[in-house]
Amino acid sequence: QEVFMWIEGNYRRNLMDMHIDDWNPEFLSRINIDEYVDALKDAGIQAAMVKGRPHTGLAYYPTKTGRMHAGLKGFDFFGTMIQKCHENGIAVIAYFTQIFDNWAYETHPEWRLVTGDGKGMREYRGMSNFKTGRYGIVCPNNAGYRQYVKDCLTEMNTLYDFEGMFLDMTFFPEVCYCPSCRRKYMDDTGRELPRKIDWKDDEWLAYVYKRDQWIAEYAAFATDCVKAVKPHVTIEHQFSRITGSWIDGSTEDIMKAVDYAGGDYYGGFLQQTFINKYYKNVSPNLPFVYHTSRCDPELVYHTTTKTEEELLLHVIT
């Protein structure tokens, strides 16, 4: 039980979302860690989630796996934040993106999630369900991508000491028909991967269930990568998609790969009242984590801020 000591009574947490590319050399070039940590202290933050590798796939620390964000000019943002937070009594949760990784998508086309149209996700524009062109999405069933994940997580846990990790985006944003998925389905079932959605077809239902198993198995794989290096580091996988559609492949089996439940939601405090009750019942340990933003109503509207009353409702719910 000692490994969970840091989460006991730790309720006031913060994440500064920083999925920032480096096509403009000014991006992140003037980031001020002292101001950042001072703001955390001023807010009484007990644990800071610090970006290590965001959706861009560009590391915020000097890395031998993939590529570092060019705007940092070699500055170890991740490591320095960990040090400064610990000096000020703030626990650190390291952030690592999964499946949503633009660097991996662009550098390794063979890792890409392939839609029913035969396209990668960045080939779409202006559509819903992550088909906006912003996110490069790769397949968790691809062996090359899994090795990359293992290398990244091993590197982060070898170079740095932190209390926990948030492994984000543990779900399928689309049905994938890549060679890895087709081969894996054949190996698992001896059948071709079905391509027609038919809820009266037993083969289709078996495939949907198999996708659920794949996501849970991937979550266990990623958790094992961390625990192999730092057994005491707590793990939180993105679990918000449990309330999404069948496409996501998110089930309560993911709870077998975490130390506590957590996920981000943007449906207001009424949604929060339900999720809080649900998470309390499925989380292996307490407290669970309910993430939400100051943006109104969600992250897309990043220039807006909820009223003080709305934020208070989130705090007391």
Task: Please annotate each region the language model reported.
Residues 91-103, 166-170, 205-248, 265, ...:
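Aromatic-lined carbohydrate-recognition surfaces of secreted/lumenal glycan-active proteins
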